[in-house]
Amino acid sequence: ALISGGGSGHEPAHGGYVGTGMLDAAVAGAVFTSPTPDQIYEGIKAIATDKGVLMVIKNYTGDVMNFEMAGEMAQMDEIKVAQVVVNDDVAVDGSLYTVGRRGVAGTVFVHKIAGAKAEEGVELEEVQRVAQKVIDNVRTMGVAIRPCTVPAAGKPGFELGEDEMEVGIGIHGEPGTHKEPLRPADEIVDHILDKILADIDYTGHEVAVMVNSSGATPLMELFIINNHVADVLAAKGIKVYKTFVGEYMTSLEMEGFSVSLLRLDDELKALLDAHADTIAFKA
């Protein structure tokens, strides 16, 4: 069984991915706040099977700590628990919320592919192996042109001028690496892909692309972005196997987007194509 979760405000993540072929449970904390160990523990108990439970955790200090505590509580109940930590963001190595890289939209690929593997009824270690394989092969980076406001804070997480953008943005409204003047979509995509392609060698591989809205970016703009992503990858000889465009992991009303690339092999392609039926994702 698969469980994931995190703060609210990222809808449809993570509750939208509960269903056939993906997650068995999702645990939501308050807005941009990790769920408590007790909440996660109750989720684990609700879905536990003889084969055990895999926790898919985004790499934020609170998430990792609380999920690990919940996992230990479940193990005391003799429930078999394993975990993977998603850290796909190439923009930042360490931030307010993290040690190391943040877990962002690439997490959805982990839900999909590990969920497909779990549907096969294999052992927990095999589901964990496949989930880790996705993490090892997925990279993401995002930008924002308008911040979001956490209700409890009452003000935006960072300030942006009318003609500015924040590069390397996180999914909790935390600032990115730097601000710079707003640029055309193609130039922004070039910068993002330069960072992603420098981090992992996609040459000669097929990839899955995810262009994800931060919450307030309309589909038309996402398709403009995706069009240039496809052009850049084609020029570099990287074949796009499948493309996902839409809202997969948002940040309240933030205006911006992220691009994720997943390097594929035959195993990952088959699992990506496998049947899934959830509110937010169907295959």
State the predicted function of each range:
Residues 19, 23-50, 197:
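Glycine-rich oxoanion-binding loops at beta->alpha junctions
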Residues 1-5, 14-27, 92-94, 165-181:
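Gly-rich Lys/Arg/Thr-decorated short loops/hinges at beta-loop-alpha junctions or inter-strand turns
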Residues 1-7, 23-26, 52-61, 68-71, ...:
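Short glycine-rich or small-residue beta-strand-to-loop segments that form or flank ligand, phosphate
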Residues 86-126, 130-137:
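Short alpha-helices
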Residues 64-78, 97, 221-227:
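Short Gly/Thr/Asp-enriched flexible loops that form oxyanion-binding sites at enzyme active sites
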Residues 195-283:
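C-terminal non-catalytic interaction/assembly regions of soluble proteins
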Residues 26-31, 75-100, 236-240:
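Short, acidic/small-residue loops that bind anionic groups at enzyme active sites
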